[in-house]
Amino acid sequence: MSSSAADPFAARLNSDVRQRHPTASATSKNVEGTSQQKQQQQQQQSEANAAASRVKKTYGKTPDGTVFVVPTTHDMVTQLLDPREPKNLSDVAVLAIIALHFLAAYYLPWGVKRPLFAAIFMFWRLAYNVGIGYLLTIQSKYKLLVTWAKRWKLFENPATGKNPRPWLYNLLKKELETKIPQDYKFEEAPIEYNTWLTFRRVVDLILMCDFISYCLFAIVCAHKPDGEGLFMCFARWAAGITLVGFNLWVKLDAHRVVKDYAWYWGDFFYLIEQELTFDGVFELAPHPMYSIGYAGYYGISMMAASYDVLFISIIAHAAQFAFLVIVENPHIEKTYNPPQPRVRCESEAGSQLQEFASEYSVPSTTGRHDNTPLPVHNLIGLKNLDFFRITDVAIVLLCAYLAVVTMVTPNTRFYQALFVLHALAWRLWYSAGLGVILTMQSEEKMFTRHFLKYGESVGEAWRQWKGIYHLSNCLCHASFIAASYKMYEFPADWTYGWALLKHVVGLSLIALQVWTATSIYESLGEFGWFYGDFFFDSKRQLTYTSIYRFLNNPERVFGTAGLWGAALITWSRAIFLMALAGHFLTLAFLAYVEKPHMQKVYGRNLRDDAGVTKFIKRSLPPPVTEWQQSIDKVLDETKHFIDEFVDAARSRLATGSSTIVKDTSALFNKYPARLTLSKISPDLAGYDPKHYGLSLAGTRVVGTNEKATGKESPNARVLKDVKTQAFEYGAPIRVKWTAPANHSKKDWVGLYMVTDNRSREVTEVPSLGRWVPTNPGEYDTTTDQGILVWDQPVEKKSEDTDLVEGEMVFEGDKLWWTQGVFEFRYHHGGGHHVMSISEPFEIQIPKFDDEHMGVDISGEVGERAVEAALLPVIRNCLDRDPDIAPSNAEERFGGHVERDGKYARRVVYAIRHMFGIDFAPAVVLADGNVRRLAWRICHAKEVLAPFSMSHTNGRTTPVDSKFSE
């Protein structure tokens, strides 16, 4: 949130304060002794204090721009349990439901309690993650909760005569005003704020019952393990209480920072006009309320000494992470991190990341390789696996060989030792061997010089290095997994000893390492993952995002957690030593390879302390801080002495390689809104389909007619008089409809493929979001956006009925992004009974035929022709949105293209059918403008020209002259 919008209020209130203070000061100097002036002074001072207090008030803004004072509210525990807080009917209902939980835990038979409370807790957990998640999702996307409140007139004053339920209005008014005695009037508050307050009461019930049912389930399952000693019992309870206390502190500190506004997802309804400051626990871990904020679950599991409680805690925690990923993160991205405005001028097109140009330095007659597109064929991830690439083939084959050998060899001590030594060798090569190569590359560009020596380019050196590093990384971890498999023994009894707990903790550590690696890759991108700044002079600035916001070197702490997890699961000395060696080698790599290079490249731009370090330093008492500073001073002096002695002065602080390539976490709008099939409406009597009609208008395709190609019989070559309309791929289509004046306000028009429906009377398939209602305000979703005109009287041409007309536009996600033959269907009354069908029309992508155009695709003229043909298609694919679609060939695409993969998929589909070139969607993201895409298309067509079937681009057989007779 930005504070700029709040500045006018602050400026106005501050001016009131400034105007009153001089008056009070002058009065006290001139007539200080009089009681009258003292009273004036006190009155003016109180006014100044009141103004100052108004300055501190929080202001909110609704989506329509309404600004209001956000009153102070209290958390649910205080509202429910503090006797000093006023109570109302909803509080009594919540407390009564909680009391029922306690009564059930006390009176039910012992054998019923455990499964019953497990089911009760899972019910409330689903109500939280699924129920609240669904409500928040539809509110974020469609403002549907506010729409429902408006439709049901929940907050409409009964005095207007428009509220059908005055009793409900009075109940809500009493409920909400009782809780907020200051700065709040039910009648004057925006509907978004009142809706949020009502939503809060539902959340209070779910959250309280969720927590209470979990605690009662833990109490029901609690027991003392057989044979547990006093020391172990004390340690278990001490650790559990510590985790619960830590959990309590996390929740309280998080609430201190975000207040009720973020605690109850207020930004789904309105925004507050002030800067967001995240300190305290928010510097300790990402999403602390969902990550370390659930530490208490595991503390309670320890105190209960129950695996049932532990497993249900893990399930609940996983469900909470799913809630975060599916519900909260998309809304956070949309609200606080919108795509950057599109760059209007592409002045840097030829210079941006020029070091990558050599990767595509192939011979060309254009000589324009200064504007070469970026490489896009990434290595990391299963989605990038390519069996036409030698690195991927080698990794798959070697891992397959390793897996086969692991499975077929016996688990004798000889083979176990052999596999452990094999894994150790790969670990040494991965950390020490590659570390030496990177050190020499940093100091004297050794790796690059080797390829330049044989006439290769810097890009070739970079590609080969990525392959070596990727292969080494995969084989290092695969060999460790194979060694762990050889040393693992399946437990004969999972309930004996610590067998089950070791597996749970071990798998958690492995998951932690996987998450850490994923976060690092998302932050650094492919360039940083493969240490690109060792090969190229990077001009990027260090930015600390994602996991690097909290840790300078996440690999130091969490990067080897999976090794210790495997050691815990296998419970093997050899694997433990392997984990120890791997951790030590990782620390050595960071200290002796990465840190010196980072110091040399980024220098003073390196950050001193990460978020966790800052938090710990601020939390220490002053004596400890002074002692720590003195120790640091002694260590620094000793370190400098040693560094000077060995002539290897290096910085004390270490940071991770933080060269950032843009975050490609795109939000995929994969599942559009859909309509549910319904029965034929019974109120069709009196509606004649002949009074309904649809007509279309759109951008027609300009090109040759290919329907008569000379391959038909002579009679079939005659073109028909009535031509089917053909519109451009992705171009908006305007639909004009006609209907009787008394038509249903819930009528709607949908777009379908002609072959999707067998019946002409009833539509048989869902519209999948490709529909627009005829009248606004009749449906809850955002379908009204396509309505242009509705219910305009039509000049009367027949005496039997009065007609009205309207107009709507289908664009963006309401279109089919494929070629084919389509039709619009007019439906009656919110159902699927068809009243009218438009004439069929085609969606076409005109082919770019350089042969008939007489254009040399390998020349600059050819590139310009491709640009001219490609630009309107790209604009259609990007919805013709000025914030996304370029106006010329040099302008970059908008930031939405990186966020939402649908745009890139539209573009590559169009290029495939227009030019016959199949690109990956990542190519569109890397090129970023039409000019680079045109260059890539021309280059691809030039390379593929010898394999083309056309005469101008080459022949399939080397025929240079006619056959001799």
From Swiss-Prot:
Q: Where is the composition biased (Polar residues)?
A: 22-35
The record ties this protein, via InterPro entries, to: Phopholipid_MeTrfase, Phosphatid-EA_MeTrfase_fun
User: What EC number(s) does its UniProt record assign?
Assistant: 2.1.1.17
Q: What is its main location?
A: endoplasmic reticulum
UniProt feature, compositional bias: Low complexity: 36-45
Give residue ranges on the Lumenal side.
Answer: 1-91, 137-201, 251-279, 328-389, 439-467, 518-573
Region described as Disordered: spans on this chain? 1-55
Catalytic function, reaction form:
a 1,2-diacyl-sn-glycero-3-phosphoethanolamine + S-adenosyl-L-methionine = a 1,2-diacyl-sn-glycero-3-phospho-N-methylethanolamine + S-adenosyl-L-homocysteine + H(+)
Catalytic class of the enzyme? transferase
Task: State the superkingdom.
Answer: Eukaryota
According to the UniProt entry, its GO molecular function terms are: phosphatidylethanolamine N-methyltransferase activity
Spell out the subcellular localization from the entry.
Endoplasmic reticulum membrane
Q: Which GO terms describe its biological process?
A: methylation; phosphatidylcholine biosynthetic process
User: What's one GO-annotated cellular component?
Assistant: cortical endoplasmic reticulum
Q: Does the keyword Translocase apply?
A: no
Instruction: List, alphabetically, the Pfam families matched.
Output: PEMT (PF04191)
Q: Could you tell me what this protein does?
A: Catalyzes the first step of the methylation pathway of phosphatidylcholine biosynthesis, the SAM-dependent methylation of phosphatidylethanolamine (PE) to phosphatidylmonomethylethanolamine (PMME).
Concerning its family, UniProt says:
Belongs to the class VI-like SAM-binding methyltransferase superfamily. CHO2 family.
Q: What protein am I looking at?
A: Phosphatidylethanolamine N-methyltransferase
Protein source organism = Neurospora crassa (strain ATCC 24698 / 74-OR23-1A / CBS 708.71 / DSM 1257 / FGSC 987)
Gene this chain is encoded by: chol-1
